[in-house]
From Swiss-Prot:
Main location: cytoplasm
Organism encoding this protein: Salmonella paratyphi B (strain ATCC BAA-1250 / SPB7)
Recorded name of the encoding gene: glk
Family label: Belongs to the bacterial glucokinase family.
Pfam families hit by this protein: Glucokinase
Gene3D superfamilies noted in UniProt: 3.30.420.40, 3.40.367.20
Its EC number(s): 2.7.1.2
Protein name in the entry: Glucokinase
Lineage: Bacteria, Pseudomonadati, Pseudomonadota, Gammaproteobacteria, Enterobacterales
Amino acid sequence: MTKYALVGDVGGTNARLALCDIASGEISQAKTYSGLDYPSLEAVVRVYLDEHSVSVEDGCIAIACPITGDWVAMTNHTWAFSIAEMKKNLGFSHLEIINDFTAVSMAIPMLKKEHLIQFGGGEPVDGKPIAVYGAGTGLGVAHLVHVDKRWISLPGEGGHVDFAPNSEEEAMILEILRAEIGHVSAERVLSGPGLVNLYRAIVKSDNRLPENLRPKDITERALADSCIDCRRALSLFCVIMGRFGGDLALTMGTFGGVYIAGGIVPRFLEFFKASGFRGGFEDKGRFKDYIHGIPVYLIVHDNPGLLGSGAHLRQTLGHIL
């Protein structure tokens, strides 16, 4: 008889829940709920389990916020809870609450070739560190290492490191944004709001007044080639994505590959392919040759957060991935 566990991927707006076959890792019966419609994460879980008439003993839910102890307070939602109390209330034997990019990193060993698009470099080296990052509402970062037949995710808040410009144009962006907001992290330029910041800084650098555009507007105008400022912003976004990925590769020696997740890049895939992304990735001066062979992949799996939550839980329960 198939034994299932509950898996989840929770952001500021939606909570996506599914079942994971503990033996195979297969994800099924995924459903998305609006977080605004429920008073707590526990309430959403109960609704899902009732709707699917399933009894589970184990669960793993990825959440887009730092996980530093038993008490979880979401940074982009009002939900807050004790992991131990939620586990007890649901009657679970195991309940893991992990960072969303911990989940994405743990999905990588489970991905197949059809879930990936490669952007330069050679073949990944087995056993070497892996980096994963992705731009969405914010900028998520994690690393993954393989030790004693176990995958160990190294999550952090790497999206909040300093934005490090490496051209006159990027330095100008930094100067304008610093005058507006003070500390300029990588996330301030590599995210949906970050794309807006790039556009605004580009326009302001020419002593003009920027329009009140959303990330979607900037992308659409750039792809339609109807706004040179939007096109410059999107082009610069791609280059800085490359630079940041190259920084991750240098920091951990990620010869196992660098993986891009998140919802932004797939929206302008053809533009990204033709952009200066790989050039930015390899623009490391004396260490260009060091980084040249490191492959970069875009993850195109529909639910890497659910897949990785399942992988994390299965490994916790003693399965070898």
